[in-house]
Design a protein with these regions (language model features):
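Beta-strand-rich interaction surfaces with strong enrichment in secreted/lumenal proteins
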Residues: 81-84, 161-163, 224-225, 236-237
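Beta-rich globular "head" domains
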Residues: 39-43, 61-65, 87-98, 146-213, ...
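Glycine-rich, low-complexity segments
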Residues: 25-56, 111-169
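Noncatalytic modules at the cell exterior or secretory-pathway interfaces
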Residues: 126-141, 186, 226-243
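Glycine-rich, compositionally biased intrinsically disordered regions
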Residues: 29-113, 149, 198
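Contiguous ligand/interfacial binding patches
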Residues: 208-248, 253
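Short, flexible beta-strand-to-coil junctions
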Residues: 95-111, 135-138, 188-197, 238-242
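Extracellular "spike/adhesin" assembly and maturation modules
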Residues: 1-37
Length: 254
């Protein structure tokens, strides 16, 4: 196997080996190869808010580009409590910022840039390392939630469809109140009231293709859980006119 799995030079005790440009450049290349995949991976993180005003952030140690020096600096893991004047009915995004080595959390209305493997930085600003998304209700309170490594779970009954009667055709189900625009998967609970004389229910789909059917017995009702891939904060639903549907968002993933 090649460098860095095998040494370029084997140094001996009390010897003065020649250090070539090839050796030094190889060291730098190896450091780059190790650093790049670590830097472009989201840190392990746990976030929660249970009182409507504070967001508790526990992020593992990570590297961020310092906003003052432009150098890449190491930030030790530590718990942080974030408070601010939260807006009404809006998303806010939390970013870790280093200023001359001093870490802080920025609350912004600017969403993160969407990377291939998930969001890493604030859109247009690599010095802002993305931590999490926060939803605020009409009263300017944080909607209660917890999040582990990009998987969000709501702690309340958050409905996005209430007593809606099917039309027999596909329609848009907007989940923007409780699902961020950069979501990649969403967990739902559907309450199905089937008024027909046979088994039936509601179907959901993403990307305008396929469909996942959730059914209830004839002249009955039931609840079904569903996790479905998405490319944002909306999917589609379809039910016959004999079916009434309620949908709750249980959580989402980025």
């Amino acid at each position: 196997m090649a460098w860095p799995f095998t040494p370029l030079v084997t140094f001996l005790s009390k010897s003065v080996p020649k250090v070539t440009h090839t050796f030094l450049n190889s060291l730098q290349s190896a450091v780059n190869a190790i650093f790049a995949p670590v830097y472009h991976r989201r840190p392990s993180i746990y976030v929660q808010s249970t009182n409507g005003s504070q967001v508790l952030v526990f992020a593992a140690s990570l590297t961020v580009k310092d906003s003052a020096t432009g150098e890449y600096v190491y930030i030790e893991q530590v718990g942080r409590t974030v408070t601010t004047a939260w807006p009404a009915s809006a998303w806010r995004y939390l970013y870790l910022v280093s200023t001359s080595g001093v870490a802080s959390v920025e609350v912004s209305s600017t969403a993160p840039a969407t990377g291939t493997a998930g969001p890493l930085f604030k859109t247009g600003d690599e010095t802002r390392r993305y931590l999490c998304a926060v939803r605020c209700d009409p009263g300017g309170n944080v909607v209660k939630f917890n999040m582990i490594d990009g998987r969000y779970l709501w702690l309340a009954d958050n409905q996005v469809l209430t007593g809606s009667v099917g039309t027999g055709s596909w329609g848009t189900l907007s989940m923007s109140t409780f699902v961020a625009p950069h979501a990649r998967r969403v967990s739902l609970m559907a309450r199905i009231t089937n008024g027909s004389g046979s088994i039936g229910g509601v179907a959901f789909r993403s990307f305008s293709t396929g469909g996942i059917q959730l059914n209830a017995d004839a002249n009955s009702f039931d609840e079904r859980d569903l996790t479905i891939a998405t490319a944002g904060d909306s999917i589609e639903w379809n039910a016959p006119a004999t079916t009434t549907v309620d949908v709750l968002v249980r959580g989402w993933e980025e």
